[in-house]
């Protein structure tokens, strides 16, 4: 049963907390949703219950933040109720790796807590990996995502260098990927999105500062990825200028605004920054996204692609949804700027790639 009605949890033997853990204004952890959920849960907590946190967070959250709030119930964690952390491991839009087939990490505040949580997850997961503590499980999740963040920052920075050098970054990545060992493929793009990747480096950096340690390399990767949409706006401006058009007054059509292909999730989508900056420069904005019918923040609705293609001064491919015929886009648009590399193999004078 999935619910946000806390009274409905009174009869449950196990509760899994999956609330958002965003960043506050100064890029520090905002655990407000978690604190509220824990406070409400403490009022209906009963002896023998299992509580598992799945929300992405910094090491120590389960033991230092969640546990004391739950113990306001008068029950002791590890003796009268069980508490564990098990990071969410899903990739929205993918069907080849499911909850059942993806190994599940579990760390409890005691061995018994870990055993109880593992017992629960074995009902739905083929493999459960038990670790020694919630802190290990919490940091495991951050490592998985920061590994991606750092490597995406690397190829995004390489893309900016290739832009200056006149080298096709996609050809470089494709060539490097032919090496059967020692290289893992990551692709550049307009920036990172989703509820985890853009956030996680700053969660770890926050906790590291408590220990008088500064994760400079990790934070730099986060900053590079945060800045990538601005580079894309500059690339749009330069591409229009090379076509003898100013960005002010030009009609720019964004193809795809969700943070990744095949989904309608707008959380931390780089398209939002791109639209905002282009509007500040005076551009007229339209977008087409089969998964995002409305952008209320900008009072925009997804436009009919066929109707918009011919009237746009520039079409920017921001999210490469599989439903779109990109050969047709290049054929019918006046100018195309591809930030996702989906036009590799197409040669056309009106086509520019990241």
Region locations from a protein language model:
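Structural/interface elements that position substrates and couple domains in central-metabolism enzymes
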Residues: 1-354
């Amino acid at each position: 049963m999935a619910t946000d009605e806390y009274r409905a949890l009174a009869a449950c033997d196990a509760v899994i907390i999956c609330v958002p853990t965003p960043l506050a204004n100064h890029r520090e952890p905002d655990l407000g949703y978690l604190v509220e959920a824990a406070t409400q849960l403490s009022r209906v907590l009963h002896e023998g219950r299992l509580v598992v946190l799945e929300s992405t967070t910094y090491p120590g959250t389960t033991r230092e933040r969640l546990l004391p709030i739950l113990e306001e119930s008068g029950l002791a964690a590890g003796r009268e109720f069980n508490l564990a952390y098990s990071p969410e491991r899903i990739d929205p839009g993918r069907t080849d790796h499911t909850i059942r087939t993806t190994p599940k990490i579990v760390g409890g505040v005691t061995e018994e807590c870990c055993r109880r949580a593992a017992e629960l997850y074995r009902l739905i997961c083929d493999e459960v990996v038990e670790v020694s503590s919630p802190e290990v499980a919490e940091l495991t999740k951050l490592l998985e995502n920061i590994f991606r963040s750092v490597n995406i920052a690397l190829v995004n920075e390489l893309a900016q260098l290739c832009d200056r050098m006149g080298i096709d970054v996609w050809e470089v990545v494709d060539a490097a990927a032919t090496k059967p060992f020692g290289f893992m493929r990551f692709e550049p793009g307009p920036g990172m999105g989703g509820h985890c990747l853009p956030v996680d480096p700053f969660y770890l950096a926050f906790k590291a500062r408590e220990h008088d340690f500064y994760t400079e390399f990790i934070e730099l990767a986060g900053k590079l990825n945060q800045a990538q949409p601005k580079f894309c706006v500059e690339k749009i401006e330069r591409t229009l200028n090379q076509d003898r058009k100013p960005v002010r007054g030009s009609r720019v059509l964004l193809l795809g605004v969700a943070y990744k292909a095949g989904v309608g999730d707008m959380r931390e989508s780089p398209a939002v920054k791109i639209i905002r900056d282009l509007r500040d420069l005076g551009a007229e904005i339209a977008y087409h996204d089969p998964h995002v019918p409305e952008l209320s923040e900008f009072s925009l609705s997804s436009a009919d692609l066929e109707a918009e293609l011919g009237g746009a001064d520039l079409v920017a491919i921001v999210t490469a949804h599989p439903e779109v015929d990109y050969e047709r886009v290049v054929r019918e648009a006046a100018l195309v700027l591809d930030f996702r590399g989906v036009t590799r193999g197409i040669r056309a004078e009106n086509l520019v790639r990241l």
